[in-house]
UniProtKB/Swiss-Prot annotation:
Protein name: Large ribosomal subunit protein bL34
Any Pfam family hit: Ribosomal_L34
GO MF assignments: structural constituent of ribosome
Top-rank taxon, per record: Bacteria
Family note: Belongs to the bacterial ribosomal protein bL34 family.
GO biological process: translation
Organism: Streptomyces griseus subsp. griseus (strain JCM 4626 / CBS 651.72 / NBRC 13350 / KCC S-0626 / ISP 5235)
Length: 45
């Protein structure tokens, strides 16, 4: 039997998909702008 692939880890989640990571690059800021435009309640992890 192989193990489950999703092993939740809040710190890794934030480091990979977090708000500060999104703000770092132009593409990431574009993602946030799109999500704001769509009216998402949660912008990032």
């Amino acid at each position: 039997m192989s193990k489950r692939t999703f092993q939740p880890n809040n710190r890794r989640r934030a480091k990979t998909h977090g708000f500060r990571l999104r703000m770092r690059t132009r593409a990431g800021r574009a993602i946030l702008a799109n999500r704001r435009g769509k009216g998402r309640s949660s912008l990032s992890a």
